[in-house]
């Protein structure tokens, strides 16, 4: 819910095992629909409210971004820039893109505007001029994947009100404006994907999603130690570090503590080397 101070208040949470998705890409729409339905049902039960529309966070290696510009003439006779002029300018950014048929625009995020000879304008509304130009970061995604998500949500009994790419959603949730102004990189490591968002001078410079996550580290540990995935995950969480120099070469981990069927001691330094690699 939106509280009186305009901040969001969490009234319900729902979770479900992520099935039918591999590295951020839907591979089984029916399994995704069942997971969405279960998570939504739990959230509705906790909150006491039903919801027929949701906001969707998009991820996957098909998420790409590129710079683009758009130009329009200021519409008012007195030359004052209106919200409609800004909207038309961003629409022109999208219109000037040459995208293949299998991709579509998710966001056109303005970085700065130029009004005649005035550059690096953050918000041109209310200013006066003749020619308005927008410099934007355009985020695109796979049309097929977006449609697959929409179909899965419909099967789950809901619809997407709007979509936002995961790196941008994560940045909006955890970064302060001062951090964006100073410049920072937000890296979000998930189970099968890792996303990043790069900010400088308050602007989003770049975002990306890579098909590598913490699950790949777990798999590497399982192979390196010749143990099960469950034991490898437990070892990673309790003893894992990406810097071998943080641990002593004589430190050892007893695998039998995680599974009675496992035997032997392994070097924690070796575990760190696997994670670092």
Language-model features: locations:
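A short acidic Gly-Thr/Ser loop motif
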Residues: 1, 58-60, 186-193, 199-202, ...
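Nucleotide/phosphate-binding catalytic cleft detector across ATP-hydrolyzing
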Residues: 2-185, 203-205, 228-276
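A conserved active-site cap/scaffold subdomain adjacent to cofactor or substrate pockets
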Residues: 211-232
């Amino acid at each position: 819910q939106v509280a009186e101070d305009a901040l969001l208040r969490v009234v319900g949470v729902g979770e479900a095992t992520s099935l039918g998705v591999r590295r951020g890409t839907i591979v089984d729409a029916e399994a995704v629909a069942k997971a969405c339905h279960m998570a939504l049902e739990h959230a509705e039960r906790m909150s006491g409210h039903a919801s027929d529309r949701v906001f969707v966070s998009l991820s996957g290696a098909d998420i790409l971004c590129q710079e683009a510009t758009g130009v329009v003439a200021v519409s008012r006779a007195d030359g004052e820039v209106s919200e409609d002029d800004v909207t038309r300018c961003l629409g022109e950014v999208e219109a000037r893109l040459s995208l293949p048929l299998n991709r579509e625009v998710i966001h056109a995020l303005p970085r700065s505007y130029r009004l005649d000879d005035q550059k690096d304008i953050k918000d041109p509304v209310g200013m006066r001029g003749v020619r308005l130009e927008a410099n934007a970061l355009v985020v695109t995604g796979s049309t097929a994947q977006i449609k697959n998500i929409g179909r899965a949500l419909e099967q789950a009994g809901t619809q997407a009100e709007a979509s936002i790419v995961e790196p941008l959603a994560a940045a909006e949730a955890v970064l302060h404006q001062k951090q964006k102004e100073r410049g920072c990189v937000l890296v979000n490591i998930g189970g099968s994907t890792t996303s990043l968002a790069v900010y400088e001078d308050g602007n989003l410079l770049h975002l990306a999603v890579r098909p590598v996550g913490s699950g790949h580290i777990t798999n590497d540990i399982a192979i390196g130690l010749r143990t099960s995935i469950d034991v490898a995950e437990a070892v990673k969480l309790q003893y894992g570090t990406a810097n071998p120099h943080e641990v002593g070469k004589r430190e050892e981990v007893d695998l039998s503590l995680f599974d009675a069927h496992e035997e032997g001691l392994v070097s924690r330094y070796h575990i760190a080397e696997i994670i670092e690699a």
